């Protein structure tokens, strides 16, 4: 039975991808082993051993609490002032019961970074080797996990960490924007780079 045009094109693309993979094999970012055709950027063994933070399961975690302390310090008190209590800031007392905090911002990381662990090659390749596709891939991986948790479903926007313009000019990209793009794709919400 003859194949349809789309089936023939898909089969042809798979053959071309297999030939390219034979000539220029794709390898796991973490361990360097050759990837199977179904694997992207990381092999199944390394993906199974990835030291996941599971921060996405908790609305309050070490990362988000530190992030919100920075928000409070910079937005409410100024960069060098110590945190104020509600009675010291009467205009904020009605806005935040029990404390003078900005609305809570969630934060999560996919995996724990250790300088000596082989997983250090993931951010290294994204940041210094220009592996933007890996950034998007791991962003989608985190985004899929975030969307399983109720407290992330009200997220409205993703804001990547800005990169100083001289570094962005030298590198040609901001790795945080690549990760944010993957997050946005998985979560169905926009990214703001401005």
PLM region descriptions:
Residues 1-194:
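Glycine-rich phosphate/pyrophosphate-handling loop used in enzymes and phosphotransfer proteins
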């Amino acid at each position: 039975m003859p194949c349809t045009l789309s089936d023939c094109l898909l089969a042809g693309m798979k053959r071309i991808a297999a030939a390219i993979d034979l000539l220029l094999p794709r390898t796991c970012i973490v361990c360097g082993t050759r990837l199977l055709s179904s694997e992207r950027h990381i092999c199944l063994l390394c993906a199974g051993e990835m030291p996941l933070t599971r921060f996405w399961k908790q609305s309050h975690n070490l990362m988000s609490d530190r992030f919100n302390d920075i928000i409070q310090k910079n937005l409410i008190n100024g960069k060098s002032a110590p945190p104020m209590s509600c009675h010291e800031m009467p205009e904020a007392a009605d806005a935040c019961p029990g404390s003078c905090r900005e609305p809570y911002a969630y934060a999560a990381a996919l995996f724990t970074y250790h300088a000596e662990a082989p997983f250090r090659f993931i951010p290294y390749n994204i940041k210094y080797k220009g592996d933007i596709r890996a950034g998007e891939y791991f962003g989608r991986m985190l985004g899929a996990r975030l969307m399983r948790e109720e407290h992330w479903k009200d997220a409205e926007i993703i804001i990547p960490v800005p990169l100083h313009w001289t570094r962005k000019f030298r590198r040609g990209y901001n790795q945080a924007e690549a990760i944010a793009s993957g997050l946005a794709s998985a979560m169905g919400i926009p990214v703001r780079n401005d």
